[in-house]
């Protein structure tokens, strides 16, 4: 079959490979690419040869940092795969990939089961309602336990796994799987070179009873999903393979169940059946139906687009990447319509026209040019100047804005100081390009020191960004120590604070009076309306036109400006609700600027009386350690102001879960290594913001304000 973009959307799968770091996502992707004929030589992450790991840093570190998009073909179906990073610092890559995918393969380590980042990625996939199948990988690993891993999918993720295969053997003796649909054994005995096909055999006698038990569970799940099938099954009739597959597919598309497969990608066992499952059970763009968006002129009005070339164009830009020859690549999911090189489209998010230069389907960092981009597929566009992540591209005659993506604020910052004037100029270019690519990378200028401060999701995230500045943009710079992204908030309401802004300097003056109330604001996620933030809410309670309508947004803007610099140490304020209750204006002297200044000053005065406190990021930390080091590990967590949440056993080791302030976690990897002779490891993800204890807060505030003794 010609390796070209398929127009039959029933045969297209847009999938992601997602997991915890080191569960084997990239290796699984490499094997898929080999078996689908894209790679003649298979790449390994440990030798820096993986196709989807194409950045220099990825090759060096053996982890996937950016989501590489790859197109391949299996059994006359087109599979567009996005290999997403498992490291928590790169959660934005996972988030934006899931937004544009139709299905995903969740890869789990057969020894570890569900790990912290697995939970985080699973939650992100649930947020975007992405159907999933599961692959229990590394079945050849010492301590691998398929049944334990399936149990963790149920217990830790609250998901309903549907076991489709059973392992034959484990660890060094893992030889294959039992296919519970066909009730046959698929074996890859001994050392299996890449490309080895499975041998179909009868089920080993010692596993026959267990296979029959799991087959019955599978059939019961299928029967319970459909009345007709239930009557047939419980009436003693045989269900056909086609009926079983159709029922499973329907449940998967509705995210009711999650089929579970197993194997070892590195040893080339179990990959082909996983590919069959992708085609059999994960949805095509047609299964998911219409895409929703809003009217450009009326955000309350919902518009829909069917996945068809005949519909008006609607597409979402989900990633920007720099290309050494073509400049800016914009990765786009086309939901409806079609587009050709040279066409003009509307960026409805920014209300700007864009012209498409070239169109590509990507194979990691290699490009395959296409003449027409069709609905339902993923492409890279060249030539878009103003489009950034989350923007909608559409037909100017039928504008629509698709749901964008929310990205978390950075939790860690470092100061970066260019070594020469030439480096200063190069740094400006580097920052602009990197910020275009990565919405969680922030840049600000410290007013006091004059330094450029960059922010990100963790130490590794910033390490990689700084490394890219040096490598790709030739910036030489000194990097400061990590800084914690503290926040401030208030603990008590302040009612009816009045402030009058008045200035008379000859001619027309400035006059604005506002009366505001501020209060702590912490709504539950389900209480928020679409588009509302938990960080800040503004309410207008003015009656009788005492503040003209056109000045109300200026008061809101003034308050939001003031929130950027808190009362205690100049950190941004969060979780505040402000209500404009009353005010006064002057026909001649009032203006938008006067009301903006009045709102800002009134808010500052109110915050000073509202018991402001400092907040710090708290990390959810999971430490895996041999039992003999438990005392050391727990003592160290307590010394870091951490709180132990739970202690469990897993695969012969102890698991300590704790909540620890980020400020106490810098350099932890080295400390943990030395305390446990290198035998313990840990992972951490951002959990929440919490109030800093008064004695610690006093030191942070003094240091920030330059009054530390």
UniProtKB/Swiss-Prot annotation:
* GO CC terms in record: cytoplasm
In Pfam terms, one family for this protein is GTP_EFTU_D2
Q: Where in the cell is it found?
A: Cytoplasm
- Record-linked InterPro entries: EFG_II, EFG_III, EFG_III/V, EFG_IV, EFG_V, EFG_V-like, EFTu-like_2, G_TR_CS
Q: Recorded GO terms, molecular function?
A: GTP binding; GTPase activity; translation elongation factor activity
Among its keywords, does the record have NAD? Answer: no
By its UniProt entry, which PROSITE patterns does this protein fall under? G_TR_1 (PS00301), G_TR_2 (PS51722)
Q: Does the keyword GTP-binding apply?
A: yes
Keywords of this protein's UniProt record, alphabetized? Answer: Cytoplasm, Elongation factor, GTP-binding, Nucleotide-binding, Protein biosynthesis
* Gene Ontology BP terms: ribosome disassembly
Q: Which family does it belong to?
A: Belongs to the TRAFAC class translation factor GTPase superfamily. Classic translation factor GTPase family. EF-G/EF-2 subfamily.
Cross-referenced HAMAP family: EF_G_EF_2_B
Q: What does this protein do?
A: Catalyzes the GTP-dependent ribosomal translocation step during translation elongation. During this step, the ribosome changes from the pre-translocational (PRE) to the post-translocational (POST) state as the newly formed A-site-bound peptidyl-tRNA and P-site-bound deacylated tRNA move to the P and E sites, respectively. Catalyzes the coordinated movement of the two tRNA molecules, the mRNA and conformational changes in the ribosome.
- What is the protein named? Elongation factor G
């Amino acid at each position: 079959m010609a390796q070209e973009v398929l127009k039959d959307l029933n045969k297209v799968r847009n999938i992601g490979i997602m997991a915890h770091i080191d569960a084997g996502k990239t290796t699984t992707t490499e094997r898929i690419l080999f078996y689908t004929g894209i790679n003649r030589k298979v790449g390994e992450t440990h030798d820096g040869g993986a196709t989807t790991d194409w950045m220099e840093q990825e090759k060096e570190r053996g982890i996937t940092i950016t989501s590489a998009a790859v197109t391949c073909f299996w059994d006359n179906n087109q599979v567009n795969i996005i290999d997403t990073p498992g490291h928590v610092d790169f959660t934005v890559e996972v988030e934006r990939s899931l937004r544009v995918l139709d299905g995903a393969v969740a890869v789990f380590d057969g020894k570890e089961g569900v790990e912290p980042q697995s939970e985080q990625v699973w939650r992100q996939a649930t947020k975007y309602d992405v159907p999933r199948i599961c692959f229990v990988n590394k079945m050849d690993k010492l301590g691998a336990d398929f049944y334990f891993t399936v149990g963790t999918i149920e217990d830790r993720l609250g998901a309903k796994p549907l076991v489709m295969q059973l392992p034959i053997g484990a660890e060094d003796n893992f030889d294959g799987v039992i296919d519970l649909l066909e009730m046959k054994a698929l074996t890859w005995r001994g050392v299996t070179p890449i490309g080895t096909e499975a041998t179909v055999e009868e089920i080993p006698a010692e596993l026959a009873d267990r296979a029959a038990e799991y087959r019955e569970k599978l059939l019961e799940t299928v029967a319970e999903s459909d009345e007709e099938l239930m009557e047939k099954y419980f009436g003693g009739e045989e269900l056909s393979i086609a009926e079983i597959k159709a029922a499973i597919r329907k449940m998967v598309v509705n995210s009711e169940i999650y089929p579970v497969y197993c194997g070892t990608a590195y040893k080339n066992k179990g990959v082909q059946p996983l590919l069959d499952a992708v085609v059999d059970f994960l949805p095509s763009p047609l299964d998911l139906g219409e895409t929703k968006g809003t009217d450009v002129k009326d955000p309350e009005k919902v518009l829909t687009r069917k996945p068809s070339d005949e519909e008006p164009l609607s597409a979402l830009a989900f990633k920007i990447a720099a290309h050494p020859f073509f400049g800016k690549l914009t990765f786009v999911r086309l939901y409806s319509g079609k587009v050709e090189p040279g066409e003009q489209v509307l960026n409805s998010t920014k209300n700007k026209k864009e012209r498409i230069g070239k169109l590509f389907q990507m194979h990691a960092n290699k490009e395959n040019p296409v003449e027409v981009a069709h609905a339902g597929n993923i492409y890279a566009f060249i030539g878009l100047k103003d489009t950034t992540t989350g923007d909608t591209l559409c037909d100017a005659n039928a504008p629509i804005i698709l749901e964008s993506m929310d990205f978390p604020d950075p939790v860690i910052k470092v100061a970066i100081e260019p070594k020469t004037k030439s480096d200063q100029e190069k740094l400006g270019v580097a920052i602009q390009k990197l910020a275009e690519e990565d919405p969680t990378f922030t840049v600000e200028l410290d007013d006091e020191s004059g330094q450029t401060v960059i922010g990100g999701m963790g130490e590794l995230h910033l390490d990689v960004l700084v490394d890219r500045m040096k490598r790709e943009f030739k910036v030489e710079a000194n990097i400061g120590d990590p800084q914690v992204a503290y926040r401030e908030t208030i603990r008590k309401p302040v009612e009816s604070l009045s402030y009058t802004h008045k200035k008379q300097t000859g001619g027309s003056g400035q006059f604005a009076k506002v009366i505001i109330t501020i209060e702590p604001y912490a709504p539950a996620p389900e209480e928020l309306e679409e588009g509302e933030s938990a960080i800040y809410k503004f309410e207008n309670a003015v009656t009788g036109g005492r503040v003209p309508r056109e000045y109300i947004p200026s008061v809101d803007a003034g308050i939001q400006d003031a929130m950027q610099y808190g009362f205690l140490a100049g950190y941004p304020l969060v979780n505040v609700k402000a209500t404009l209750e009353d005010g006064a204006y002057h026909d001649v002297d009032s203006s938008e600027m006067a009301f903006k200044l009045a709102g800002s000053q009134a808010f500052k005065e109110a915050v000073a009386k509202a018991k402001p406190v400092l907040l710090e990021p708290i990390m959810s930390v999971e430490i895996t350690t041999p039992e003999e080091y438990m005392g050391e590990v727990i003592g160290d967590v307590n010394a870091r102001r951490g709180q132990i949440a739970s202690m469990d056993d897993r695969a012969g080791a102890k698991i300590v879960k704790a909540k620890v302030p980020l400020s106490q976690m810098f350099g932890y990897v080295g400390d943990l290594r030395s305390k446990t002779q290198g035998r313990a490891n840990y992972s951490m993800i951002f959990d929440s913001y919490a109030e800093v204890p008064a004695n610690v807060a006093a030191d942070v505030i003094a240091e920030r304000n330059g009054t530390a003794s």
